[in-house]
Amino acid sequence: MVKNTVKHVDSSKHLEKVASLIKEGKVKKICVMVGAGISTAAGIPDFRSPETGIYNNLQRFNLPYAEAVFDLSYFRKNPRPFYELAHELMPEKYRPTYTHYFIRLLHDKRLLQKCYTQNIDTLERLAGVPDKALIEAHGSFQYSRCIECYEMAETEYVRACIMQKQVPKCNSCKGLIKPMIVFYGEGLPMRFFEHMEKDTKVCDMALVIGTSLLVHPFADLPEIVPNKCQRVLINREPAGDFGERKKDIMILGDCDSQVRALCKLLGWSDELEKLIDTSVETLTEEISLLSVDSTIEKNASEQKKDDNSVNPFTKIEEKKKDEVTLLVSDDE
C-alpha cells in the first residue's frame, strides 16, 4: 500500500545520498526496476490517461472493455485492435530516453545486477542493455509465435506486417501470430521467476524508476529485497510500500530530470551524453535501413499478391548477413 503520510520529500538531499553510496563503493549490485514512466519522455503514451492514453485511442474499435486489446480470447476473435496498437508502439518511431541510457551506463560500469522492466517497447534493448542483463517481465515485441501451433515467427515478417497494419499469420498452420507480450490470464516469462529470487537476494540497491507498482507479481520485487538492501524510488509520486522501511529513499519528480541530476552528482554527465550521441547516430542509420526494407517489402507484396494468400506478404526475402536488425539481442 502507498503511504499517505508522506508530507515532504527532499529530493536533492536524497539524490546526494544515492550518489554518495555509489561513489564510495557501498553499492555494487543494483537491481533496476522500471515502468512506463521512463518511456513517456520518448513520446510513448501511457495506457490510462483520459485524453492521450492508449486505451482512449482504441475506443473507435468499440472494445467491450479497454483491456480487451490484451485479452487472448478477444484477440482470437478480433486481432486488429491489438495490431493497431502494435503499429503505434513500433520501436522505429521512438528513441530511448536519458533513463534508458543511464541503465546502460550502469551496465557498462559493472554496477547493474539486472534490469527488470514492465515495458514492452524494447527501448532498453535499443539503448544497448544486453539480453543477459534484462528481464522483460511482461514480454516484448522482440519475439513472436503462433497462438495455435506455437511455431516461432520471423521477426522481420512480423515487423513488416505491423508496419503495414496487417495481421500476420503462421506460415505452417495459418493461425494468428502474437508477439510474446503477456496478455491477461497468461503467466509471466519463466525467466522472470528464475532470476528474481537470486537477484533480489544479492542486490545491495533496488532502484525503482517510473512505476506506480500496482501490477503484481512485478510489484513484489522491491518488497522482497532484504532489509539490508537500500531501496530507492524515482517517480512522480510515492509508490508501493516505499516509506515503510527506515532506509527508504524517495526522489519525487520527472524520471529523466532526476536521473540527469544524479549523473551530474556522480560525475557521469559527459559519459552519458557521449553514449547517447553515439547511440543516436547508430540508431538513425539502422532505422533508415529498415524504412527502405519496409518499402521494398510493400512493393514486393503488391507485385506478388495472391488472392488466396492469408498473409500480406507472400515471401520475405532472405536477408544479407550484414543487414542491420532493429531489435538486437546481445549474445556475448
Swiss-Prot record:
Pfam families: SIR2. The keyword Transferase applies. Its cofactor is Zn(2+). Its EC number is 2.3.1.286. NAD-dependent histone deacetylase, which could function in telomeric silencing, cell cycle progression and chromosome stability. Belongs to the sirtuin family. Class I subfamily. It comes from Schizosaccharomyces pombe (strain 972 / ATCC 24843). The active site is at residue 138. Binds 1 zinc ion per subunit. GO terms for cellular component: chromatin; chromosome, subtelomeric region; cytoplasm; cytosol; mating-type region heterochromatin; nucleus; pericentric heterochromatin; rDNA heterochromatin. This is NAD-dependent protein deacetylase hst2. One of its GO terms (molecular function) is histone deacetylase activity, NAD-dependent. CDD domains: SIRT1. GO terms for biological process: pericentric heterochromatin formation; rDNA heterochromatin formation. It catalyses: N(6)-acetyl-L-lysyl-[protein] + NAD(+) + H2O = 2''-O-acetyl-ADP-D-ribose + nicotinamide + L-lysyl-[protein]. It is found in: Cytoplasm; Nucleus. It comes from the Eukaryota. Keywords: Cytoplasm, Metal-binding, NAD, Nucleus, Repressor, Transcription, Transcription regulation, Transferase, Zinc. It is an enzyme of class 2 (transferase). NAD(+) binds at residues 35-55, 118-121, 210-212, 235-237, 255. Residues 7-269 form the Deacetylase sirtuin-type domain. Its main location: cytoplasm. Zn(2+) binds at residues 146, 149, 170, 173. InterPro entries: DHS-like_NAD/FAD-binding_dom, NAD-dep_sirtuin_deacylases, Sirtuin, Sirtuin_cat_small_dom_sf, Sirtuin_class_I, Ssirtuin_cat_dom. The keyword Iron-sulfur does not apply.
